[in-house]
Amino acid sequence: MSRYRGPRVRIIRRLGTLPGLTNKTPQLKSGSINQSTSNKKISQYRIRLEEKQKLRFHYGITERQLLNYVRIARRAKGSTGEVLLQLLEMRLDNVIFRLGMAPTIPGARQLVNHRHILVNDYIVDIPSYRCKPQDFITIKNQQKSETIISKNIEFYQKYKIPNHLTYSSLEKKGLVNQILDRESIGLKINELLVVEYYSRQA
């Protein structure tokens, strides 16, 4: 299944706020909430499916990519659900988004694809690059790159940067301090339901 490129508002109306996908919030008409499901029981499969879809659309990844992350998380030590979230959060496109260098994850992915971003002084143009503690993220020293990102930083620095990241406005540099903990996830999600959804595939 390919990456979603359709209307983002339609997705957040169905799944709720997804800050990685869009900075808009769902506007529901009064009395329209859960109209289609208020009189019938929602199946457990649908609940798991919707949690899975939240992850996929928030982080902007394909079905195959998400399944691969679940498989990696299952082989790792610790809680599969928590490891899964750590893998997704440490993607370069997400780190750029959480630092406030881009308004959304698709916006961050575009910066990476267009070679505006350096990791440890080397250009990285792979959005799925897995960041590690002590990695530092900077802007390519070109006026166009700095102008694009400086505008984002000025606006989005009002939002709190999670504890596992640091951004220096003076140096225009982001730093990955550590692997994030569960409380730093910027998404309302039940990751255990996602793991259960993939229990027969991973």
Curated annotation (Swiss-Prot):
**Primary place of residence?**
plastid
Q: What PROSITE patterns does this protein map onto?
A: RIBOSOMAL_S4, S4
Q: Name one GO cellular component term.
A: chloroplast
Q: Note one Pfam family from the annotation.
A: Ribosomal_S4
> What are the S4 RNA-binding domain coordinates in residue numbering?
90-153
Q: List the NCBIfam families hit by this protein, alphabetically.
A: PRK05327.1, rpsD_bact
Query: Cross-referenced HAMAP family, in alphabetical order?
Result: Ribosomal_uS4_B (MF_01306_B)
Q: What name does this protein carry?
A: Small ribosomal subunit protein uS4c
